[in-house]
Amino acid sequence: MFHDVRMRGFKRRADVDEVVAWVDALPVVEATASVPLADARGRVLATALVSGVDVPAFARAAMDGWALQGEDTFGAGETDPLTLTVVGTSLPGAPHDGVVGRGQAIRIMTGAPVPAGADTVLRAEDGRQEGDQLSVRAPSAIGRHVGQPGEDIHAGTTVLPAGRVLRPQDLGVASSIGQGALVVHERPRVLVLVTGDELVPPGTMPDASCIADANGPTLRALIERDGGRAEIRYVPDEADALRAALEGAEADTVFVTGGSSVGEEDHAPRLLHELGTLAFHGVGLRPAAPAGMGLLGTRAAFLLPGNPVSCLCAYDLFAGRHVRRLGGRVAASPYVRAHGTLTRKIASVLGRVDYVRVRLTAGRVDPVMTSGASILSSTTEADGYVLVPRDHEGWREGSEVEVFLYDALRS
């Protein structure tokens, strides 16, 4: 049964773990596309990449020098050099096509194919060439300075696993085995409906009657960081306008910012209930207690609080998980975690998770702000956040805590 909380308040707040479990159980339809390597950085590999070739495909010189038979160098020294005849040259892309016999050598450059008959490469500093005569001044063991076929990658090797967020060097590896394109997950489309008659778009100077939107730019950057494509639309604080926007939504998931709390103009929860399913409204989380989520048909919809820090918190813990799952990424937070010691206590209450902005300096964790859902500047001053679990009443000064770092992301 739908409970209209406007001007009444919440009867129950869902546990954070309960909401996370619901998000992670949402069905995900995996859409894939083939993209050229030039466009693949940062995309998520949909299928494992298996090499069909050895890399290198041929024995190649690891040094500049001469390709020859190692046996012809045994016993050579500075005071007792051996002499061989140079019968050709092997260059990268222009190999020597003959066979190296006993007493012969081929001038060779790094990366060039080692010709048939040769089994070692004598370093340039270990020989002297005059005309076609090579003076060998040090022995070169069989196999020395020769890169063998497949020493980098063997045919049949899985070089990149499915689910990998592609890095620049991954694209180089793909190219080295002959791939010009890769099959990746499609980037999920996220429609963000920003509500609030008091809001004006980015680039507009705020004044006594309006507020420049902060949630739209923040969410766009977060969504794109997590592999999605964001479309931002501004919707008046009118039920009919929001209803039309929800009914016409063409996206893989829908976010509504603002209009999710207990005010008279907070229409989003009621409309989500009427148009689909309102799974949760109200979470035991500070500062994102008014958050909600549900379904529009088969698509997830997230009601994110209008206060900027609450919006960021609800994205970090809930909505972002779904964006990442839709795009084939790991659902868990992308923030790298560190540990430090609290410089002062953090107070909380049982039954609620607290998202606390903190600075981390040389292992010391300093709370920036434990409340103030509208103070977005606190997140720019912070290095990250800590989460106080629902079964804690806070942490004392000196406690060891885990920090989620805003600027450090795992791939």
Predicted regions mapped to residue ranges:
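Short, low-complexity N-terminal leaders and the immediately following helix N-cap/first helix
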Residues: 1-78, 329-355
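Helix-rich terminal scaffold detector
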Residues: 1-16, 180-304, 308-314
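Short, glycine/charged-enriched hinge/interface segments at domain edges or termini
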Residues: 2-14, 66-233, 365, 369, ...
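Generic structural signal for well-ordered, non-membrane alpha-helical segments
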Residues: 12, 16-20, 33, 37, ...
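Flexible glycine/proline-rich
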Residues: 20, 33-38, 42, 47, ...
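Predominant activation on well-ordered alpha-helical scaffold segments within soluble catalytic domains
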Residues: 20, 24, 64, 124-125, ...
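Structural signal for hydrophobic packing residues in well-ordered secondary-structure cores
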Residues: 24-31, 48, 70, 114, ...
